[in-house]
Swiss-Prot record:
This is Golgi apparatus membrane protein TVP23 homolog B. Keywords: Acetylation, Membrane, Transmembrane, Transmembrane helix. Belongs to the TVP23 family. It comes from the Eukaryota. It is a multi-pass membrane protein. The chain crosses the membrane at residues 34-53, 54-72, 126-146, 152-172. The keyword Oxidoreductase does not apply. GO terms for cellular component: Golgi membrane. Pfam families: DUF846. GO terms for biological process: protein secretion; vesicle-mediated transport. PANTHER family: GOLGI APPARATUS MEMBRANE PROTEIN TVP23 (PTHR13019), GOLGI APPARATUS MEMBRANE PROTEIN TVP23 HOMOLOG B (PTHR13019:SF9). It is found in: Membrane. Residues 1-21 are annotated as: Disordered.
Length: 205
């Protein structure tokens, strides 16, 4: 079950991530979703390997380009719609309303049982490591292709930067805005507790 809160043009939710867990909750180090964890890295790492070894794997530029783009497209869909939801309980998407206004939506998983409230720390690290490291590599490849005048490969590399950078941007924005939401909730909670305590003291006196 996913919950979402909405503002004018963005929709925020509280972050569901291992590092946001309170200290009194046990953290799970085991991988709870091995298939999702595998495919979270498989497509993006495979695209990088094909790019680096394309000269050895095939002499056809078109074949290598199509293979890399297919792997990047599969990675974009899997990370955006599956692995983020399963591994860290986050999902982002965008929709346009009837007035043509764009709305960013950030969702987090709401678990019913205490057992499922703890995100696997191992999965969280795998998720964020793969999410951040691979786009950085594509940026390096972009500069390398640019300075070595490999113009035909530049379009492929830019595709990698755009597709993987989009997921990175979406999840980081979700993370940052959700932290702000958690901060405002905590401030409101402690403010109510402070007022309640002061009100109780005034009544007893």
């Amino acid at each position: 079950m996913l919950q979402q809160d909405s503002n004018d043009d963005t929709e925020d939710v509280s972050l569901f991530d291992a590092e946001e867990e309170t200290t009194n909750r046990p953290r799970k180090a085991k991988i709870r979703h091995p298939v999702a964890s595998f495919f979270h890295l498989f497509f993006r790492v495979s695209a990088i390997i094909v790019y680096l070894l394309c000269g050895l794997l095939s002499s056809s530029f078109i074949t290598c380009m199509v293979t890399i783009i297919l792997l990047l497209s599969c990675d974009f869909w899997a990370v955006k719609n599956v692995t983020g939801r399963l591994m860290v309980g986050l999902r982002w998407w965008n929709h346009i309303d009837e007035d043509g206004k764009s709305h960013w939506v950030f969702e987090s998983r709401k678990e019913s049982s205490q057992e499922n409230k703890t995100v696997s720390e191992a999965e969280s690290r795998i998720f964020w490591l793969g999410l951040i490291a691979c786009p950085v590599l594509w940026v390096i490849f972009a500069f390398s292709a640019l300075f070595s005048f490999r113009v035909k490969w530049l379009a492929v590399v830019i595709m990698g930067v755009v597709l993987q950078g989009a997921n990175l941007y979406g999840y980081i924005r979700c993370k940052v805005r959700s932290r702000k939401h958690l901060t405002s909730m905590a401030t409101s909670y402690f403010g109510k507790q402070f007022l309640r305590q002061n009100t109780g003291d005034d009544q007893t006196s």
